[in-house]
């Protein structure tokens, strides 16, 4: 009996310490107000209706996020269905509903809703009205400004209509004729962000191994008269980093109504990020109004590193040749399908490091927390647009390239972009990678091709 108690205590200590390490490795997001859970171990119950297959034809409860097949809805299909004569993929649709509160204190602010991943076509409806155009593509984050659709001080209803098979043939060819299980549903988190009318919408950062720093910030609203204050601190010990002229901040006054603001400077005594020593820093961006009040704060983790490619020679990281020893990885869990969590990402990244490997690719954009783990543990990453031997058409492909890069652009682990997975590239979308990765302009490759 005593041995059993001791064993249980040891397991409890292990998982407590493991979760603590995982939380430290994962980037925090205090700006998010979650409507779903954050992973397979943290879900919320929504109402759900499935059109066909198991448990169809009636309203039931479902946990979000999670692929609906793993909760007993619809039908399973494997991606090589087309190799069996007469077989068709399951194509059920699902309707999700969830009610949430909108306090009166949100008046005068912008409210945006974010979906981190829905398979495959998603129509978003707020209080009976569409939030925007149909989103297509199962591996990408998308969002809508829903300010004008909300009822302040009341319950509001979110409805999501999801089609497992896309109405776009190129998406089905790129994502759903592949050597993996074909799932449906809201499988990554859903959240709200409440923002001031004038705010920093998106930012792109560049930080080299000598401390040179650039930020390109997209503003929403007329920010003339505002200023942006940038500071950097060490993630490890919280110590403030100083600029080359001895200041703790870089202040950028916004003297025009332009949407893009460029900031540059240099930070001193930087310890570079590498695969052997993945040193991370926290960049804080503060937006101040003309009266000097901070109206918005955004933080993200960065690593100061320089990536260079030389023909017939190879990849250099911070001036030292990097011998890449890589592995492929899928985002998958036995309980959630494509729904995972930060602890699983941590475990996979740790196992890859223990195999003496230093690089990863994973067929499609992974969960963001896996990139966080690569940042924290020192794995370089090739971020890849989905497209298993077939490419997206130019219109939808352009949108999905933008969504992938805007989500992932500031991760130091990413050293390469890949336009398509194992042969699924569209050359018309090639220029967009440098357009959205506008500061670092990392190399983009075509898998299986002698390109770039």
What residues fall within each predicted segment?
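N-terminal carbohydrate-binding accessory modules
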Residues: 32-37, 203-204, 284-352
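Accessory beta-strand-rich segments of carbohydrate-active enzymes
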Residues: 27-32, 49, 67, 91-202, ...
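Bacterial Sec-dependent N-terminal signal peptides
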Residues: 1-28
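Substrate-binding/catalytic cleft of secreted carbohydrate-active enzymes
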Residues: 349-352, 359-452
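Beta-strand-rich binding/interaction modules
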Residues: 126, 212-250
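Conserved, mostly hydrophobic/aromatic
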Residues: 128, 190, 281, 319, ...
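Accessory carbohydrate-binding/adhesion or oligomerization-edge regions at the termini
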Residues: 16, 24-80, 161-170, 237
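Short glycine/proline/serine/threonine-rich loop/turn segments at secondary-structure transition edges
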Residues: 106-109, 150-155, 266-280
């Amino acid at each position: 009996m005593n041995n059993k108690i001791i064993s249980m205590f040891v397991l409890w200590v292990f998982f407590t310490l493991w979760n603590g390490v995982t939380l430290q490795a994962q980037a925090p997001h205090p700006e998010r107000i979650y409507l779903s859970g954050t992973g397979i171990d943290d879900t919320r119950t929504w109402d759900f209706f499935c059109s066909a297959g198991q448990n169809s034809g009636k309203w039931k409860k479902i946990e979000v996020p999670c692929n609906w097949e793993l909760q007993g809805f619809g039908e399973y299909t494997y991606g090589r269905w087309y190799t069996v004569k007469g077989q068709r993929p399951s194509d059920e649709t699902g309707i999700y509903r969830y009610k949430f509160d909108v306090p009166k204190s949100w008046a005068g602010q912008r409210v945006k809703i974010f979906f981190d991943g829905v398979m495959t076509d998603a129509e978003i409806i707020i209080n009976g009205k569409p939030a925007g155009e149909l989103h297509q593509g199962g591996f990408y984050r998308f969002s809508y400004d829903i300010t004008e659709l909300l009822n302040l001080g009341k319950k509001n209803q979110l409805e999501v209509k999801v089609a497992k098979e896309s109405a776009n043939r190129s998406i089905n060819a790129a994502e759903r004729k592949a050597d993996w299980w074909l799932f449906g549903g809201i499988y990554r988190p859903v959240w709200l962000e409440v923002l001031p009318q004038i705010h920093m919408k998106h930012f792109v950062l560049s930080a080299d191994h000598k401390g040179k720093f650039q930020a390109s910030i997209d503003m929403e609203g007329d920010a003339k008269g505002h200023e942006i204050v940038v500071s950097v601190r060490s993630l490890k010990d919280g110590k403030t980093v100083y600029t080359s002229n001895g200041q703790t901040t870089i202040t950028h006054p916004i003297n025009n109504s332009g949407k893009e603001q460029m900031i540059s400077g240099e930070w001193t005594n930087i310890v570079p990020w590498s695969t052997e020593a993945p040193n991370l820093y926290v960049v804080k961006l503060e937006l101040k109004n003309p009266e000097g009040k901070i109206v918005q704060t955004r933080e993200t983790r960065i690593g100061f590193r320089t990536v260079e490619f030389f023909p017939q020679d190879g990849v250099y990281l911070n001036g030292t040749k990097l011998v890449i020893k890589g592995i492929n990885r899928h985002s998958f869990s036995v309980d959630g399908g494509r729904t995972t969590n930060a602890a699983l990402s941590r475990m996979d990244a740790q196992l890859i490091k223990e195999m003496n490997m230093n690089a990863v690719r994973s067929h499609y954009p992974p969960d963001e927390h896996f990139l966080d783990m690569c940042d924290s543990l020192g794995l370089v990453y090739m971020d890849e647009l989905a497209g298993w031997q077939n490419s997206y058409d130019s219109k939808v492909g352009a949108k999905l390239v933008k969504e992938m890069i805007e989500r992932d652009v500031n991760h130091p682990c990413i050293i390469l972009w890949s336009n398509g997975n194992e042969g699924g590239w569209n050359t018309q979308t090639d220029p967009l990678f440098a357009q959205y990765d506008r500061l670092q302009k990392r190399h983009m490759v075509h898998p299986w091709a002698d390109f770039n």
